[in-house]
């Protein structure tokens, strides 16, 4: 009996396929056709049509499933269904993993439903290391605008790299390759996370860190070029995502401390394929809005406590410089480990806005390459706090 979908959908499916392409969606009627058509071209070209495209939908009101089913996917079969469980990306992706297990698939490719830059060769890049026996899990490696992926840049990338010892540039990138071994690992844990934030936006970080901890092969990064999608203004609409992603990340860090505390060095996760040289689309960032949200949020007592000795400086400058951000984040982790209070993660949000404001001002005259160096150099400051964190957890 499946947890995340109605077993009736299995009746019309093939008994076995080599690859499953999963597209989680919610109100993505405008973009899903392009993603599924491109995925089909990739399956035809690189898997000789031996695959299926799966649209796991969250009850879209704009006809997403219907648009998907009308799309010409050549000789590649497809299925669309409403997943079961908490509404969220995680429930959708776990339903695809369950389905892939039923179809004895050798690999899953996950693609975001709002992608505008996906190409057929992405299917090969995200599965190549798996099919060649090099890896059980492949993350995307994109060329991104310096203001795209702020939760990744300021929290997930430096924390995962410094604590878990693998520098994975896009641990929550959304477009992944998953091999058989990890399918089994995820399904073993699926019922225990079905009612948590993993069922929402916590899924990507949960999958990535589980792959680091539970696979005896390296996590690979697939060079995919630019990620062009419906970008989000950090100050406007990332607050729920921040709480779900960072809450999940904190849970995993606390629960798996015995596994990561002995990891000493940081290795760059290998990149598969040549990195295409592509110009990225500009993204607008409203720095004044971020500063306003920082000051507004600092009226909250918990946020003030997290800012601690730095409160006066932060209020005056209306931003959170890197060293202060690292101190705040690690102190929050230590505090969180005591009783896993989700309010604490929520209290980080305004300070995160202040961190993004500082980064945006610092890099405003930099090109993408220069800003990328700033992001990568942050890891050293995070790594310097690791011993202190181990002592106090």
Swiss-Prot record:
The UniProt record lists the keyword GTP-binding: no
Entry cofactors: Mg(2+)
Temperature note: Optimum temperature is 70-75 degrees Celsius.
Protein name: Glucosylglycerate synthase
Notes on activation and inhibition: Inhibited by EDTA and Zn(2+).
Catalytic reactions of this protein: ADP-alpha-D-glucose + (R)-glycerate = (2R)-2-O-(alpha-D-glucopyranosyl)-glycerate + ADP + H(+)
InterPro entries named among the record's database cross-references: Glyco_trans_2-like, Glycosyltransferase_2, Nucleotide-diphossugar_trans
Domain of life of the organism encoding this protein: Bacteria
Family the UniProt entry places it in: Belongs to the glycosyltransferase 2 family.
Binding partners and assembly: Homotetramer in solution.
Cited PANTHER family: GLUCOSYL-3-PHOSPHOGLYCERATE SYNTHASE, UNDECAPRENYL-PHOSPHATE 4-DEOXY-4-FORMAMIDO-L-ARABINOSE TRANSFERASE-RELATED
pH-activity relationship: Optimum pH is 7.0 (at 60 degrees Celsius).
GO molecular function, one term: glycosyltransferase activity
Function: Involved in the biosynthesis of the compatible solute mannosylglucosylglycerate through a nonphosphorylating pathway. Catalyzes the synthesis of glucosylglycerate (GG) from ADP-glucose and D-glycerate. Can also use UDP-glucose, with lower efficiency.
Alphabetical UniProt keywords: Glycosyltransferase, Magnesium, Transferase
Phylogenetic placement of the source organism: Bacteria, Thermotogati, Thermotogota, Thermotogae, Petrotogales
EC number of this enzyme: 2.4.1.268
């Amino acid at each position: 009996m499946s947890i995340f979908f109605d077993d009736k959908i299995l009746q019309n499916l093939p008994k076995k396929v080599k690859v499953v392409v999963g597209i989680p969606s919610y109100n993505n009627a405008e973009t899903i056709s392009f993603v599924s058509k491109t995925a089909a071209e990739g399956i035809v070209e690189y898997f000789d049509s031996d695959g299926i495209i799966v649209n796991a939908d969250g009850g879209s009101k704009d006809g997403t499933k219907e648009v998907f089913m009308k799309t010409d996917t050549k000789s590649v079969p497809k299925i669309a269904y409403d997943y079961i469980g908490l509404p969220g990306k995680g429930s959708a992706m776990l339903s695809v993993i369950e389905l892939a297990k039923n179809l004895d698939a050798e690999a899953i490719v996950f693609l975001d439903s709002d992608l505008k830059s996906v190409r057929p060769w992405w299917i090969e890049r995200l599965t190549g290391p798996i099919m060649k026996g090099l890896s059980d899990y492949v993350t995307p490696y994109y060329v991104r605008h310096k203001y795209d992926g702020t939760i990744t840049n300021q929290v997930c990338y430096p924390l995962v790299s410094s604590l878990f010892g693998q520098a994975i540039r896009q641990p929550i990138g959304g477009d992944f390759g998953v091999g058989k071994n990890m399918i089994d690992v995820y399904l073993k844990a699926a019922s225990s996370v079905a009612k948590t934030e993993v069922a929402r936006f916590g899924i990507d970080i949960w999958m990535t860190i589980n792959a680091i901890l539970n696979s005896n092969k390296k996590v690979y990064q697939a060079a995919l070029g630019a990620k062009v999608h419906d970008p989000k203004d950090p100050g406007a609409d990332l607050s729920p995502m921040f709480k779900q992603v960072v809450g999940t990340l904190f849970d995993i860090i606390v629960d798996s401390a015995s596994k990561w505390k002995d990891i000493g060095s940081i290795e760059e996760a290998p990149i598969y394929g040549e990195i295409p040289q592509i110009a990225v689309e500009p993204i607008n960032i409203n720095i004044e809005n971020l500063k306003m949200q920082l000051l507004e949020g600092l009226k909250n007592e918990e946020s003030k406590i997290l800012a601690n000795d730095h409160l006066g400086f932060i209020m005056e400058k209306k931003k959170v410089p890197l060293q202060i951000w690292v101190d705040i984040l690690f102190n929050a982790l230590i505090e969180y480990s005591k009783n896993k209070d989700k309010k604490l993660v929520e209290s980080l949000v305004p300070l995160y806005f202040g961190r993004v404001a500082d980064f945006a001002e610092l890099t405003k005259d930099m090109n993408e390459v220069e800003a990328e160096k700033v992001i990568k150099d942050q890891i050293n400051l995070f790594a310097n706090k690791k011993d202190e964190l181990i002592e106090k957890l």
